């Protein structure tokens, strides 16, 4: 097997990070709630890792405070419900957090292959640990 491209590493990191966000917020049965509309669903079915600041900003793409569970309707068809998500973020992490994330998103970040590999290893291990703790697949 050859060396993975940065593009493939980014995609793999997205996968593990998304699973982490959804699993950490799930019940032991795997149920999560959309942070913007409250809809309930299984973390694997119709629920996604929504980003307050767009994924195009690498400085906040894998920032846990920038992400929360969203249903497909809110995340895709309602452009992420950014205003509602900002309220959720400020309620969860403290007033001004959403504004700080907006500033952070403007920073230019260049990740190396090692950065991606380390983050993949980190989130993959946490996902596996959460699955064991919650006894879900």
Q: How would you label these PLM feature ranges?
A:
Residues 1-33, 109-114:
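Short, charged surface segments at domain edges that flank catalytic/cofactor-binding sites
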Residues 5, 9, 59, 77:
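Conserved aromatic-histidine-acidic binding/catalytic patches
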Residues 39-42, 67-94:
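Short Cys/His-centered divalent metal-binding micro-motifs
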Residues 2-6, 52-55, 71:
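Short, flexible active-site loops
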């Amino acid at each position: 097997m050859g060396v993975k491209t940065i593009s493939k590493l980014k995609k793999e990191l997205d996968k593990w990070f998304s699973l982490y966000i959804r699993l950490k917020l799930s019940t032991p049965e795997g149920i999560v709630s959309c942070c913007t509309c409250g809809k309930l669903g299984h973390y694997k079915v119709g629920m996604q890792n929504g980003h307050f600041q767009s994924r195009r900003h690498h400085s906040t793409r894998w920032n846990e405070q920038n992400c929360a569970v969203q249903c497909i309707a809110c995340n895709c068809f309602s452009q992420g419900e950014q205003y509602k998500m900002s309220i959720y973020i400020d309620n969860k992490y403290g007033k001004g957090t959403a504004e700080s994330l907006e500033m952070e998103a403007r920073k230019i970040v260049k990740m190396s292959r090692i950065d991606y590999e380390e983050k993949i290893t980190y989130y993959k291990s946490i996902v596996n640990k959460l699955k064991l703790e919650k006894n879900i697949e």
